[in-house]
Amino acid sequence: MLSFIIKRILWAIPTLFGVSIIVFMMVHLVPGDPALVILGEKANQAAIDALREQFGLNKPLIEQYFFFINNVLHGNFGTSIMTGEPVMHEFWQRFPATVELALIALFMALVLGISVGVLAAIKRYSVFDYSSMTFALAGISMPVFWLGLMLIYIFSVQLEWLPVFGRLSDVYYLDGPTGLYLIDSLIARDYGAFVDTIKHLILPSIVLATVSTAVIARMTRASMAEVSKEDYVRTAKAKGCSSFRVIFVHTLRNALIPVTTIAGLMLAGLLGGSMITETVFSWPGIGKWIVNALNQRDFPIIQSMSLIIAMMYIGANLLVDILYAFIDPRIRLS
């Protein structure tokens, strides 16, 4: 197991190196000068040159790249051009908001998606099967921004049941150790803030979970249908095992292997920040932060976050491979 993990980490190094080159070139090929974005079109040339000198934007691209890589290897991801704050300082300020939203959304997607997929597989070719898979297809096809705007219009504007944006109402203040408001509000015993946090989480988490739920439901159904044809499932039925044991012990456990793969990648994507959802709901996470950085040509943030998100995907893949061994003992990581 340890040798497998070490090999995967070593293989990740050239992957990250390739990602860094591609992202660096793409960022610098995009039209626009960060100095002009910050100072405005009417800024004098001396001020523009001074700002470009401050952030090293006047140096050759190859020199800028190796300067960036050298800093990353020393744990320095640079300084934001717009705010002057260290990139990692701003990242850790926003990451808890994204983590909280991502975990809630993934939990909802796994519970609903697997449940619907299992029921659809059990009641194959029934009305429930056709209707649930139709809704799943609609969920995959539905534009995220449209769904977010519709939920805001119905539940926030018309019914006034839920807040429109943000993580917490202005009447509450939390400064806990985790940055996760659900946990920090319980630590502080501020139950009003806890309820308010849940209200703020409902709409964005539903939007974020919709596509994931649909994908997991369809994959669970397909995997269950395939596994149910295996010899060991037929043997379990022939031995007189109960339907519950056949479904949840022999069929579902093996059907979860492809679901685990997609769930791991979903988690990495959600932790990387859902840009559209966070922007629609003004959620103060890293997704909205990256969108702002793209609009403002903030190269250090874009480059650093691309590397960090790539690390998340590599870590998620490694975690999924390790989980395989627990789900199916026949799999040998070595």
What kind of feature is each model-predicted range?
Residues L2-S3, I13, F95-F128, V144, ...:
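Alpha-helical transmembrane segments of integral membrane proteins
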Residues I6-L16:
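N-terminal signal-anchor/signal peptide hydrophobic helix marking the start
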Residues I9, L51, L61-F77, V87, ...:
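Hydrophobic alpha-helical segments of integral membrane proteins
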Residues T15-F66, F155-A193:
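Hydrophobic alpha-helical transmembrane segments of membrane transport/permease proteins
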Residues V23, V27, P31, A35, ...:
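Membrane-water interface at transmembrane helix exits
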Residues V30, G139-M142, L271:
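Transmembrane helix irregularities
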Residues N58-I114:
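An internal, D/E-rich "acidic patch" concept
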Residues L119-M142, L147, V157-Q158:
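Short loop segments and helix-boundary regions at transmembrane helix junctions
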